[in-house]
Swiss-Prot record:
TM stretches of this protein: 8-28, 104-124
Similarity comment: family membership: In the central section; belongs to the AAA ATPase family.
Role played: Acts as a processive, ATP-dependent zinc metallopeptidase for both cytoplasmic and membrane proteins. Plays a role in the quality control of integral membrane proteins.
Binding site for Zn(2+): 418, 422, 493
Main subcellular location: membrane
Organism: Thermus thermophilus (strain ATCC 27634 / DSM 579 / HB8)
Lineage: Bacteria, Thermotogati, Deinococcota, Deinococci, Thermales
Protein name: ATP-dependent zinc metalloprotease FtsH
EC number: 3.4.24.-
Amino acid sequence: MPRAPFSLLALVLGLAFLAWAFSLAGTVGAPSGTVNYTTFLEDLKAGRVKEVVVRAGDTRIQGVLEDGSAFTTYAASPPDNATLEGWMARGVSVRVEPPQGQNALGFLWPLLLVGLLIGALYYFSRNGRAGPSDSAFSFTKSRARVLTEAPKVTFKDVAGAEEAKEELKEIVEFLKNPSRFHEMGARIPKGVLLVGPPGVGKTHLARAVAGEARVPFITASGSDFVEMFVGVGAARVRDLFETAKRHAPCIVFIDEIDAVGRKRGSGVGGGNDEREQTLNQLLVEMDGFEKDTAIVVMAATNRPDILDPALLRPGRFDRQIAIDAPDVKGREQILRIHARGKPLAEDVDLALLAKRTPGFVGADLENLLNEAALLAAREGRRKITMKDLEEAADRVMMGPAKKSLVLSPRDRRITAYHEAGHALAAHFLEHADGVHKVTIVPRGRALGFMMPRREDMLHWSRKRLLDQIAVALAGRAAEEIVFDDVTTGAENDFRQATELARRMITEWGMHPEFGPVAYAVREDTYLGGYDVRQYSEETAKRIDEAVRRLIEEQYQRVKALLLEKREVLERVAETLLERETLTAEEFQRVVEGLPLEAPEEAREEREPPRVVPKVKPGGALGGA
């Protein structure tokens, strides 16, 4: 059956070719002996032409010479009566034939060809609906995936978003028993917009709603609607909602709705581009739901600031549910969910791992456990150990360890003092985070890093931010103190310090010279954000100077601290050169001057030192 459209197309092309061939069948083929018009006139004057045949209105002249040979020539214009009489005066037999009537197929074959093609397209559109790949107009059909069976995911499989689940339980009750709400005259929200940074589980939560309510789940992406063909997006929106009505009660989920729901008038093409037509159709369809239609539209975005206001008004996306990165309790619950089916060793402490992964979202935690499982399988172990999880966390944050990279003794020494500087500043500064781990094992683009012991915190004080800047600058300060020289390793440290200092001045009102004034508006908070400048060039110069002074003050402060703790700095750096990695407990013992236990495993022998391309030292908080 799938080959039928191709057979029909071959038939159409064959008929078109026959029509063209028949159109030429009635015409006289060009005979042999074609001569130019000058030769014909010379033969005419010489009396060698016996007979000519002309057709009225035709420039072609056919004839026979005295020797019996046939010829054909072409004049610039059809011969007139005077010309023909002149030829007859020379004794030439002239026969004039009426204009040749084109056969019907020859005259109508272009129209016939067009008609056949239109008929074929109509056939495709009518009979190819069984499968989108067989239909000539399948690009107007929605690309949504319809899961007629309820997803197996339920609220039990979602963690770290308890408030969002509470908000959505009402939607679940409506989908389970819509008549109860209709009898009370209640109008359930037509649309629910899930807002949050990437990876927090917006799509997972939408599937859980469908699974909890046991209704079909229809999912599409915002980019599925917009195409280069005008009107395709609107047609796909109509088809999507027609599909939803056939499967009601159901959930329609549109992921990354900002691809189609961007504010109108802000893109290329003004009010006439394809994306805006698609958005208009989406608005119309959401308005077109009858009161008793049990269809709930859910959408997800991490850019709510660019959505069209008409999309967010009551009656469309009535509710916006913000889903943020989980706290320590939520992270532990997420880890336990993703740890199902994975053999964990007895030393695994998921609560401790949750404390050590602030800022991780659900996707990060799932990836962490998967990396740990891969590491355990690679090493031939039958269970995942805490060491595997720690290594996986480092891989997720900083990249895989470059065990084959052998540094020169000078580079290792610089890296050790650089990271020791970060660690001592984080340890001794009152409002800093403390040290979770410090290492000089290269990872990603870093030759080493200091991982701070951060906690979930929503409010950052001015003193804490100043200490953060000082910790970021401590690596460069240690280099200057020990080597009386500086390297390029603090590039990323400077970026972090400068960004914090600038935001303290322009956004958070933490500088006495500028006061509680917002000089910049930060947009797009879920994707890292960018600043919209709202001040003059003169103010910009003052801000730049204030940023420089603030950073210089913190640099001198942390440099003085490291000079005071020079002996401890040497001790930590030398221990790093010996052991490469220090945990929080080991670092504390080194700072206090206590001996360390021997490593559990013998260190693998390294290759002889060799010169390698310079890679910038730094850390999770510090260098690049």
